[in-house]
Swiss-Prot record:
It catalyses: Transfers a segment of a (1->4)-alpha-D-glucan to a new position in an acceptor, which may be glucose or a (1->4)-alpha-D-glucan. The keyword Phosphoprotein does not apply. Its EC number is 2.4.1.25. One of its GO terms (biological process) is carbohydrate metabolic process. Its main location: cytoplasm. GO terms for molecular function: 4-alpha-glucanotransferase activity. It comes from Haemophilus influenzae (strain ATCC 51907 / DSM 11121 / KW20 / Rd). Keywords: Carbohydrate metabolism, Cytoplasm, Glycosyltransferase, Transferase. The gene is malQ. Belongs to the disproportionating enzyme family. The keyword Cytoplasm applies. It holds the Pfam family Glyco_hydro_77. One of its GO terms (cellular component) is cytoplasm. This is 4-alpha-glucanotransferase. NCBIfam families: malQ (TIGR00217).
Length: 699
């Protein structure tokens, strides 16, 4: 429903909260937000009650430039006498003076980082967080004069003779070493966000329990120091029945999350007991390191452990739906804890909480070792990680800090011709008002947790730093409105953490991106995300010189089919079989696919990647090795400084890791690669494939 009937008072409140009263749809039509929706969001976005430690304002500025802070942002009573103090992150006082000018406070240029500006009178104190940003996000030196490539995988999909039925950090180590030998400068993986141990089949890495904590299911257990010293667990592992179980899990074409989690916990629980009581010098030393880890991570680490303990009790049957996942399905008394109840539960479940904290420590330890392995292997970038838009509604993140999220709203996408009813992702948005009052500390912590072990970080739906489509609880996506976020401040933080962690940022910017957002992303040198499947314009694919330079280019993504499957329309067949697409809509999809394929063939002919006599009819031509290689070679020669090669495409495998618009109808997030890693890196044809990619990049 479109409406302009919004009172002036509500308009002013909405604009102050960043709620867009209108937007242009994909066809250029002006759509007005519904008054009821606007009113609901205004209520959700009211400033929190002023609390100790809260910031009154936040200002973003560039490093090494003079800073003018305009005091009308604070509404200071003019009758009082004020002084100000500037402190850095270590609380060292950099400046302390009497405030003589009540209009502008001028500060000297500062190095990049976080600062606090405090303004005092005898009765009042105002706290302003300064976000002093580098001019750009981190730019790896290797990209100054080289076009690089890497391999991208869904980590869980890897096969080997060593893993326990799911690709793990041991497989990732092998992939890093072998890819580096072939000339790759990074290995890209799916998000490693913590899932729900109580409901292991809720496996989407884009709908996790926490974006701050890691998925311990990827642990390479035999590589743990505790495993190497614990004879009883080693003996258990060698048992014929256990080896048979592991072999069966390896053979399966889909990851059996429930069985693998149960098996890994059967090993990890006695290993934790061994870790606690062993008197060997190595384990005693490790206990001291773990104690320091607990101290540094503090209560947030313990709360994710408590969440897992309670969730395992409440979901003992390991089943949940979207409206009962995580804390949404718990008894009422545990859904919203008082400080006293939280403290009591932390004490009651201390031992089990320590176990989950230990699993986080082990996971971080192995991931850190993997990034070091990248450097030792000669990779210039290392691990390419992925950051989801947000955690899911029933998550540990939301439960442990409910004020930070608007749980009575969801994020998604407005209606468009491809999705006439819009999209509801059922992810609760950050409350930007609360985020700003906290000086963006939760956002900073989350970014740092994701960047510290990666050389590259892809940010899913980077537009979310600028605005998100909010949907009121109980309403459809069509009833939503855009809510703007403090873009300048979030970009400043992104640049600070990127440079500190030496992490290149890729912003997933598919779809319509406003000019002001595109300009800002370019200013900060955030790499664009360029997908071949979506690159066709007016019946042509771009020439290699027309590919954006500051971009990561790839054939597909986790949400689209592999090249083989795309070419043979297997995804459309699946959508038809599942009743998602049929009739005229399905026919349009098939027609569009043929047009895209023909356009790609024509463009490859145009640029001499295919010889003149080569078959050029997309309707009758099947995908085959030569065409596959030429598409990759075309991508490799493109102007983009970074390209990604997906292992499923090298293997010519027909696969869709995720089929959008499905949940239980299709085995999303569990399909495996057709061949083990050892085959991929010993196969002569694939070695030649890697040589061609290197040649294309070095042109």
């Amino acid at each position: 429903m479109v409406s302009m009937q919004i009172s002036d008072s509500l308009k002013q409140k909405a604009e102050k909260c960043g709620i867009a009263l209108s937007h242009y749809d994909i066809d250029g039509h002006l759509i007005f937000a519904d008054e009821k929706t606007v009113s609901t969001f205004v209520e959700l976005l009211q400033p929190p009650p002023k609390a100790k430690g809260q910031f009154d304002d936040v200002l973003a500025a560039f490093e090494n430039e003079p800073i003018d802070y305009r005091l009308n942002r604070l509404d200071l009573p003019p009758s009082a006498e004020y002084r100000y103090q500037l402190t850095d992150e270590s609380n060292a006082i950099l400046l302390e003076k009497i405030l003589s000018n009540l209009s502008v406070l001028s500060l000297p240029p500062l190095p990049f980082g976080y600062y606090q500006l405090s303004i005092f009178s005898d009765t009042e104190q105002y706290r302003i967080r300064l976000l002093i940003s580098p001019k750009t996000a981190f730019q790896p030196p290797v990209l100054e004069n080289k076009k690089v490539w890497g391999v991208n995988v869904q980590l869980y999909s890897l096969r080997s003779e060593q893993n326990w039925g799911i690709g793990d950090f041991g497989d990732l180590a092998y992939l890093i070493e072998q890819s580096a030998k072939q000339g790759a400068d990074y290995v890209g993986i799916n998000p490693l966000h913590l899932p729900y141990p109580a409901v292991p089949n809720w496996a989407s890495p884009y709908s996790s329990s926490s974006r701050r904590w890691l998925n311990f299911l990827y642990l390479d257990i035999p590589d743990l120091p505790e495993f190497k010293r614990c004879r009883s667990v080693q003996n258990w592992f060698k048992r014929e029945d256990i080896q048979a179980k592991i072999a069966a899990l390896r053979e399966s074409d889909c990851v059996d999350y429930s069985s693998i989690l149960a098996l890994k916990l059967t090993a990890l629980e006695p290993l934790f007991d061994f870790f606690q009581r062993s008197q060997s010098v190595e384990i005693v030393t490790r206990r001291k390191i773990f104690a320091e880890y607990l101290k540094n991570k503090g209560e947030p680490l313990l709360l994710q452990g408590l969440f897992n303990v309670l969730d395992l009790q409440e979901h003992a049957d390991h089943q949940a739906e979207e409206n009962t996942i995580g804390w949404l399905g718990w008894r009422k008394e545990w859904q919203h804890l008082s400080a006293a109840k939280r403290k009591a539960l932390l004490k009651t479940h201390h031992e089990k909480i320590q176990f989950f904290a230990w699993l986080q420590w082990l996971t971080e330890e192995q991931l850190s070792a993997l990034q070091n392995l990248c450097k030792q292997s000669g990779m210039k970038l290392g691990i390419y990680g992925d950051l989801a838009v947000n955690s899911s509604r029933g998550s540990a993140d939301v439960w442990s800090d409910p004020d930070l999220y608007c749980v009575n709203a969801s994020i998604g996408a407005p209606p468009d011709p491809l999705g006439p009813v819009g999209q509801n992702w059922n992810l609760p948005p950050y409350n930007p008002t609360v985020l700003k009052a906290r000086g963006f500390a939760p956002f900073i912590d989350m970014l740092c947790a994701n960047m510290q072990y990666f050389g590259v970080l892809r940010i899913d739906h980077v537009m979310g730093l600028f605005r998100l489509w909010w949907i009121p609880k109980g309403k459809t996506a069509a009833d939503g409105a855009y809510v703007h976020y403090p873009f300048d401040e979030l970009m400043a933080i992104l640049a600070i953490e990127s440079v500190r962690n030496e992490c290149l940022i890729i912003g997933e910017d598919l779809g319509t991106v406003p000019d002001e957002v595109r300009w800002k992303l370019n200013e900060f040198q955030i790499f664009s995300y360029f997908v071949l499947y979506f690159a066709q314009r007016n019946g042509e694919f771009p020439r290699i010189s027309d590919y954006p330079r500051n971009a990561y280019a790839t054939i597909g993504t986790h949400d689209v089919p592999s090249l083989q499957s795309f070419w043979h329309c297997r995804d459309l067949e699946l959508f038809n079989q599942l009743g998602i697409l049929n009739g005229e809509v399905l026919k349009q999809k098939y027609d569009q696919r043929v047009m895209d394929k023909q356009a790609l063939l024509n463009s490859l002919h145009r640029d001499n990647y295919l010889p003149p006599h080569y078959e050029g009819d997309a309707l009758s031509m099947a995908m085959h090795d030569y065409l596959n290689r030429m598409i990759h070679y075309y991508l490799a020669e493109s102007n983009s400084r970074l390209i990604g090669v997906q292992l499923e495409n090298l293997l010519s495998q027909e696969i869709s890791f995720n089929l959008p618009s499905t949940s239980n109808e299709y085995p999303n997030w569990c399909k495996k690669l057709a061949q083990p890693l050892a085959f991929i890196f010993s196969n002569e044809a694939l070695k030649t494939f890697f040589v061609q990619i290197n040649q294309g990049r070095n042109v």
